[in-house]
Amino acid sequence: ELINKGKAYVDSQTSLEIADQKGTPTKPGSESPYRDRPVEESLELFLKMKNGDFKQGEHVLRAKISMSSSNMLMRDPVIYRVINSPHPRTKNTWKIYPMYDWTHGESDYIEQVSHSLCTLEFKPHRDLYDWFLDQVVDKSKIRPNQREFARLNLSHTITSKRKLLSLVEGGFVSG
């Protein structure tokens, strides 16, 4: 859908070339030579990425946002990349995988999470979270909101999701 709307494109550069184009916090980035690739060509390449026709790193799907944004995360971020390794659960079903910044908002939206609570290091990611949601949101559904907070460390209390899950799975607590 994003490719059809002209809001994403398949980039065929190396990860090093993409990184070099990002610019710096004080200098805008430069556009990929593939940024204006025809929609039909990007759709065809993306289908081939999904089918496993390419090696890891040959192509990525990037959002088409702005290479001059003051927020470097908004400079045409990678959304999907090819990974040619079996997944622990789905094995070889999938050949492409989404990047965290895309998946974060998308999964919150699908699961109808109203508020995504994140620690402060995610504050720069909020613009991207909101941009992604703007592309997929259905006005009749809940639109998630990302909110950041300072990390809270409590003494003698477990708050880590991983540690809590381990306690539940180990049968030490229920929940």
Model-assigned labels for residue ranges:
Residues 165:
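A C-terminal cap/extension of S-adenosyl-L-methionine-dependent methyltransferases
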Residues 1-146, 153-159:
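Active-site cores that bind ATP or allylic diphosphates and position pyrophosphate for catalysis
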Residues 161, 169-175:
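Short, intrinsically disordered, charge-balanced linker/junction segments flanking boundaries
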